[in-house]
């Protein structure tokens, strides 16, 4: 009888451990404002314009023990661009650049995750921007995970990437304005 009880306990513990090791699904916390897609681009080679996209959301699957099994899917509303200057925002949103009337969304879907360190990874995926889909790599950092004060469970990440705007059919205003640096930061709330 004791052997059966110990075997059942061992099996239960193994199943529980296996269940905890499975990837969990998360929703990016847009409502709590714990999600940012910021960018920086050269202005005529003299300074930088900084901006953000205010309206985006997404989901991801993550298991810290198997980061290579992670997946992320993000959609961004291009008209939510904000650079703290209304006329510039209007110009960047126009046909000259993003053409948000014709291309109202940008989308990123991961295709592979490769660990590069204890808490870092290269996230490769397809970015659709301005009607063009190209592979990009996001240098990602896992910031941590745990219970939050509201009874949920969260995981947080940062990521950076550099885009060549010509690759997406977007012409910068000059030779120094062809690359855009992305800085992404978000928390995800685990789905129940």
Curated annotation (Swiss-Prot):
Residues 1-23 form the signal peptide. The keyword Hydrolase does not apply. It is found in: Periplasm. InterPro entries: Lipid/polyisoprenoid-bd_YceI, TTHA0802/YceI-like_sf, UPF0312/YceI. SMART domains: YceI. Keywords: Periplasm, Signal. It comes from the Bacteria. One of its GO terms (cellular component) is periplasmic space. The keyword Signal applies. Belongs to the UPF0312 family. Type 1 subfamily. HAMAP family: UPF0312. This is UPF0312 protein PSPPH_0448. It comes from Pseudomonas savastanoi pv. phaseolicola (strain 1448A / Race 6).
